[in-house]
């Protein structure tokens, strides 16, 4: 049986302890067989349609675009059960785990959306669920932590390192090394050791496939660009996959610039990283001059990751996709703008992609069609944003008062 290519150009691979190689090979074989199994595909499709709520809508914004020449469409993954695109591939991997006879699921989460999606899939399919989450993220994503626990998941706060997503990934991988005979590691993004980047892409590619069909029905042509935020990169690769061969469609990923690319406070390895080995793969990585992993930063927990999926690295290297960035301030501004102009509250992650789309729309000099993957809803972020805005208001009042003295 033909095996999948573990590399995308020079990126990817299986850089894991020898003890995990049998588990990864078992997973690859199970995935290849499942892709060819009509019963598996039927069950997956049925869950996506009747449980998760696919296909999701493609919404033309009425007031968001600052330019009459540019139309901005939103692919509404925020409407999916669970509140984000994460549900798609989690259902696929959970079904794979059952197919392999696993009884437990181990997962990592940043914003909590992958954790919530994993918890709901485990509840549905009667699997034990353990979720590793950086202690900082536990603090800033308390609604999602409660959701996970409500659905029966055990949430384990990780206090090592920066206490964020990369540390949760390391702990989850460590746990899996000791329990892979009974547990499946349900990785949450299109990164990590082969075959995860390929599996996650294939279980997310319906995002772009639906978008292509919907935009052709609505506009009679393909979009000029599809735009998605990039942390590890699963929502973006799900959107890009069906457009990669459509050369006239620009693929634009938006990384978190945090406090600015020229500061240490960002999470943009494609713009500012060097190739290294991390999390079982060869990929661009934020590292210092001695090769130590730098701490990534973003206002959005789900983008706070020091590396990126290997297929994105390859798309960037070949020039097929371009990767831009948006700062915390730009994302916060667009988070509020979408809420006020369209009555839709986006996830802070998605707001990074929206911020760049608005910038592109403003600069359009001819009729332009843009599609943004609205990867998740913003319920989980409202308290974070409220705190930031309150602090900004207080700082501004203090400045005004000192100016009047």
Curated annotation (Swiss-Prot):
One of its GO terms (cellular component) is cytoplasm. It catalyses: (1S,2R)-1-C-(indol-3-yl)glycerol 3-phosphate + L-serine = D-glyceraldehyde 3-phosphate + L-tryptophan + H2O. The keyword Nucleotide-binding does not apply. One of its GO terms (molecular function) is tryptophan synthase activity. It comes from the Bacteria. Its cofactor is pyridoxal 5'-phosphate. Pathway: Amino-acid biosynthesis; L-tryptophan biosynthesis; L-tryptophan from chorismate: step 5/5. The modification N6-(pyridoxal phosphate)lysine is found at residue 86. InterPro entries: Trp_synth_b_CS, Trp_synth_beta, Trp_synth_beta/beta-like, TrpB-like_PALP, TrpB-like_PALP_sf. This is Tryptophan synthase beta chain. It comes from Shewanella piezotolerans (strain WP3 / JCM 13877). The lineage of its organism: Bacteria, Pseudomonadati, Pseudomonadota, Gammaproteobacteria, Alteromonadales. The gene is trpB.
